[in-house]
Amino acid sequence: MARVKRGVIARARHKKILKQAKGYYGARSRVYRVAFQAVIKAGQYAYRDRRQRKRQFRQLWIARINAAARQNGISYSKFINGLKKASVEIDRKILADIAVFDKVAFHHSG
């Protein structure tokens, strides 16, 4: 059997991981073993947080709408219920934007 020399492939794989770990602190950006673990963990966090971001933004929008609605003397749930009954189909993202940047329009919507 022919001798298999794997140096090129191993170096390429190591380079790829170290490139991904660029900017990490200390050994995490220099030592392959540590960098590999850091990159794997970073990927797990990124995967988890892409899902959490959607929840967090919805929470933020609801908090902003609630605050603006209460300034106009109505609770969030009653405000949303009123919009549903009036068959107004504006999502929470746009409502929150209006609540923050156009208080007059928001006041007239409720």
Swiss-Prot record:
Keywords: Ribonucleoprotein, Ribosomal protein, RNA-binding, rRNA-binding. One of its GO terms (cellular component) is ribonucleoprotein complex. GO terms for biological process: ribosomal large subunit assembly; translation. InterPro entries: Ribosomal_bL20, RIBOSOMAL_L20_CS, Ribosomal_protein_bL20_C. One of its GO terms (molecular function) is structural constituent of ribosome. Gene3D superfamilies: 6.10.160.10, Ribosomal protein L20 (1.10.1900.20). Disulfide bonds: none annotated. Binds directly to 23S ribosomal RNA and is necessary for the in vitro assembly process of the 50S ribosomal subunit. It is not involved in the protein synthesizing functions of that subunit. Belongs to the bacterial ribosomal protein bL20 family. This is Large ribosomal subunit protein bL20. It comes from Shigella boydii serotype 4 (strain Sb227). The gene is rplT.
